[in-house]
Amino acid sequence: MKQYLELMQKVLDEGTQKNDRTGTGTLSIFGHQMRFNLQDGFPLVTTKRCHLRSIIHELLWFLQGDTNIAYLHENNVTIWDEWADENGDLGPVYGKQWRAWPTPDGRHIDQITTVLNQLKNDPDSRRIIVSAWNVGELDKMALAPCHAFFQFYVADGKLSCQLYQRSCDVFLGLPFNIASYALLVHMMAQQCDLEVGDFVWTGGDTHLYSNHMDQTHLQLSREPRPLPKLIIKRKPESIFDYRFEDFEIEGYDPHPGVKAPVAI
């Protein structure tokens, strides 16, 4: 994950001081891209320990179309707590948009099922896209989508994916985002009998919060270790039937975890 450390250093070297919605302050750059060949290993940051349980359960939660944190709490995942209301609801965030995007005539579009059908039946399409950025429902969401738009691409029997992330918390959020979408590519590829290709991450406002600087320098002082390998133990009937127990990360030997405050 040398690319991740290079991005951190780039933000430190070239970033502009900006104010932000949370009032914390950031160093920010605009427009950055990283490419991860998923054949080379699973792109899980090794210069600090990442909480894999949270990454997997959050993705499974998205895929169920869920927008209440009850499932996450049942599985000891607290990453959405700060934004939930007193009933645990977040409004029409990722899961709702992925699985039940509302249309003007009262229907709902299941974007995940749609792209799966496209990958199986029309893999050369340039429209294999999922969007979470529903401008008609942004004001109802506890947090507007940061990872907003992703596209799949099939070539030579391999499935690749590019994500556009409009806002990126490089220290806390980005390691989760990279691993989550890499996991999704593996799952979609398995369901479509494809090999994995590249995960391409594209960032808009790409920033380090002012209260993450010490933690950033600590990570930059550490040498990246070899990437682990993802093992999916079974092939479920559908993309929606995976369970936490289906995934194993082999050979993950990270440096110790590094804590940092969340900007809300």
From Swiss-Prot:
What residues form the catalytic site here? 146
Q: What is its main location?
A: cytoplasm
**What's its catalytic activity?**
dUMP + (6R)-5,10-methylene-5,6,7,8-tetrahydrofolate = 7,8-dihydrofolate + dTMP
**GO biological process entries:** dTMP biosynthetic process; dTTP biosynthetic process; methylation
Tell me the CDD domains matching this sequence: TS_Pyrimidine_HMase
* InterPro entries found in the cross-reference section: Thymidate_synth/dCMP_Mease, Thymidate_synth/dCMP_Mease_dom, Thymidate_synth/dCMP_Mease_sf, Thymidylate_synthase, Thymidylate_synthase_AS
Q: Which GO terms describe its cellular component?
A: cytosol
What residues does dUMP bind to? 21, 126-127, 166-169, 177, 207-209
Alphabetical UniProt keywords: Cytoplasm, Methyltransferase, Nucleotide biosynthesis, Transferase
Residues involved in (6R)-5,10-methylene-5,6,7,8-tetrahydrofolate binding: 51, 169, 263
Subunit structure, interactors included: Homodimer.
Q: Which family does it belong to?
A: Belongs to the thymidylate synthase family. Bacterial-type ThyA subfamily.
Query: Tell me, what does this protein do in biology?
Result: Catalyzes the reductive methylation of 2'-deoxyuridine-5'-monophosphate (dUMP) to 2'-deoxythymidine-5'-monophosphate (dTMP) while utilizing 5,10-methylenetetrahydrofolate (mTHF) as the methyl donor and reductant in the reaction, yielding dihydrofolate (DHF) as a by-product. This enzymatic reaction provides an intracellular de novo source of dTMP, an essential precursor for DNA biosynthesis.
Extract the NCBIfam families matched here: PRK01827.1-3, PRK01827.1-5, thym_sym
Q: What is this protein called?
A: Thymidylate synthase
Source organism per entry reads Shigella flexneri
